[in-house]
UniProtKB/Swiss-Prot annotation:
Keyword Methyltransferase: yes
Binding site for S-adenosyl-L-methionine: 28, 30, 55, 77, 103, 123
Subcellular location: Cytoplasm
Function: Specifically dimethylates two adjacent adenosines (A1518 and A1519) in the loop of a conserved hairpin near the 3'-end of 16S rRNA in the 30S particle. May play a critical role in biogenesis of 30S subunits.
Species name: Xanthobacter autotrophicus (strain ATCC BAA-1158 / Py2)
UniProt name for this protein: Ribosomal RNA small subunit methyltransferase A
Family the UniProt entry places it in: Belongs to the class I-like SAM-binding methyltransferase superfamily. rRNA adenine N(6)-methyltransferase family. RsmA subfamily.
Amino acid sequence: MSALDDLPPLRDVIRRHGLSAQKSLGQNFLLDLNLTGRIARASGPLEGATVVEVGPGPGGLTRALLALGARRVIAIERDQRCLDALAEVSDHYPGRLEVISGDALKVDVRPLVGDGEVRVVANLPYNIATLLLIGWLSTDPWPPWFSSLTLMFQKEVAERIVAAPGSKAYGRLAVLAGWRTTARIAFDVAPSAFVPPPKVTSSVVHLVPRSEPLPCALSALEKVTEAAFGQRRKMLRQSLKSLGVDTAALLKATGVEETARAEEIDVDGFVRLANTFAQLKSGAGAAA
C-alpha cells in the first residue's frame, strides 16, 4: 500500500483542522484525488523531478505529486491554517516535501530548487494567478529555471493565455506566453470539483518554455503591446503614437499596415515591432 493510501481522506483533514476556503486568499480546495492525479500527470513524468507548488491548501495536489514520483515538492502556502495538514503529508513522505510559509509573489524559489529538472504544478489562488504567470514568463535569463508550467486558471484567463490572433481573447498575455512558450489547455474542470464551487469553469494550462524564443527585449515588447492593446479598437497608426517614435516609420520598417489593429498582429509581428521600436528609440536618444 502506498503512502497516499495511508493518508486520511481530504474531507476528514479539512474537518479535523477546521479548514475552510477563504475568498480573500482566492482559495478553492480540490478534494477529488482522481482529479489531482490528472493534474499532476498533465505535467508529464515526475520521477526524479523537483516540483514547485503554489497554494497547496490541505495538500490534495501535493499528495498526487509525491505519489507519482516527484523527488521533491516545494510547496508555498500563505495560509497558516493549512500548515499542520501539510505537515501530515510531509510525515508520510519523509524528506520529500518542503513547505514554505509565505506569499508566493514575494518568495524567490530559484535558490531553493537546486540542479535537475524543475516543474511548476499548481491549482493557483485565482486572485494572484495572472500575476504569478507573468512573473514566471518574465524570468531573466531565458530559458528559465523551470522546464514546464502546469497551472489551473479560471477558464476565461486560460483562453487569454492560449488565444490566437483575430480572437477577442487575444491580447498582451497571449503575446507574452506565445513568445516564450508553447501553451495549450490540457482540460477543463467543472465548478463542482471544488469546495466551495466557484461560479466559473476552470482550465488546466500546460506551458513549455521555448529554448530559443525570437530575440527581443522584454521591456520593448511590453511597451509595444501595452500601447497596442491599450486602445485595441484603434488602428496601430493611432494606438502606437504613445510610444514617442515616428509611428509611420515604425510600421513601415516592420511591414505592418498602418490600418491594422492589435488583435490582427501575430507574435512574430509584435516581436518585429518591439525590436524596431527599440532601435528607433535608441537612435532618437543618440541624436538628442
